């Protein structure tokens, strides 16, 4: 049993340079999938002052005006003004996309199992790469996410809402939030110890105004009052000034916010990024499947906290390993849970794609404010439609 301790997670806004890159990569992916659900996409984006570079490997029958997709995405985020050092109408966009390597394609199109004459059509697609992926759920919030990352995302969504609605017209698109939560010895969140918000702003607004607005209109409306007390510390724009931001302040790159995208460091991460990748890339699809499994396990009351690891070999359909850790919070054995997983979840790439309906243009909405625990959009891997099946499998094992 742990003693009382602190844990910190961060989130960044949709106007953060790395997140601009993620959103551009996923907007291109969505545009391809809209025309060609079978599109193979691995799309990486770099953004810097006045420039966007899009590279990667794409095999598709779709025709997409990539320049237009890039510019629309940037403008929608809020970079419409040349004085921000980056704007959707005037930045340069360089596109350098190749086809998927035929050596990779042959293993994805025709898995080891289907080459060895297995007749199951879901064995046809091999994993697009080797790798390991983690999914996680914990009963700290209604959406079964760790509290620090959940609060950090909510703060960032609120800041964006106040900016886009014009209520706080001095806000600019780039922002970051960080929340430190104090846990008791039973790993239950007790209070928020520290909140950090840094938000880009216009030249003529005072630091006092920003600090007051962030405290009253963001922090106190987002974080439940029972978590805040007179010892909670607030650091709002602690450098004193944040006028230069976005790609003018820092260059951005797809896949550099993998902890923000997942569990805020509260659970392990296999290292593979999500944005710009179609669902044959198990970095993305198997991470979604692992979250789906873990969330349904916790919702079914089989554990209060659950981490699922999946691992794959390139060109092979079946995962090479599936493991479960319930951190001694399980109501049944981990072995029983593993049996229930095998009975209820098809973890071959084609099985995951079918189970979660992943060949749709649904990805741009995941590219900011987290891929998991989202309450503002309907994501198939967040559904709790396997709870009864898991309970039934466990009941059957107990007879």
From Swiss-Prot:
Arranged from A to Z, the UniProt key words for this protein are: ATP-binding, Cytoplasm, Magnesium, Metal-binding, Nucleotide-binding, One-carbon metabolism, Potassium, Transferase
Cofactor needs: Mg(2+); K(+)
- Give binding positions for K(+): 44
Which pathway does this chain act in?
Amino-acid biosynthesis; S-adenosyl-L-methionine biosynthesis; S-adenosyl-L-methionine from L-methionine: step 1/1
Record flagged with keyword Cell membrane? no
What does the record give under GO molecular function?
ATP binding; magnesium ion binding; methionine adenosyltransferase activity
**Manner of cofactor binding, per the entry note:** Binds 2 divalent ions per subunit.
Q: Kindly state which reaction or reactions the protein catalyses.
A: L-methionine + ATP + H2O = S-adenosyl-L-methionine + phosphate + diphosphate
Residues engaged in binding L-methionine: 57, 100, 250, 281
The family database entries (Pfam families) matched by this protein are listed as:
S-AdoMet_synt_C, S-AdoMet_synt_M, S-AdoMet_synt_N
| Functional description taken from the UniProt entry | Catalyzes the formation of S-adenosylmethionine (AdoMet) from methionine and ATP. The overall synthetic reaction is composed of two sequential steps, AdoMet formation and the subsequent tripolyphosphate hydrolysis which occurs prior to release of AdoMet from the enzyme.
Self-association and partners: Homotetramer; dimer of dimers.
Say which family it is in: Belongs to the AdoMet synthase family.
- What protein name does the entry list? S-adenosylmethionine synthase
Q: Which gene encodes it?
A: metK
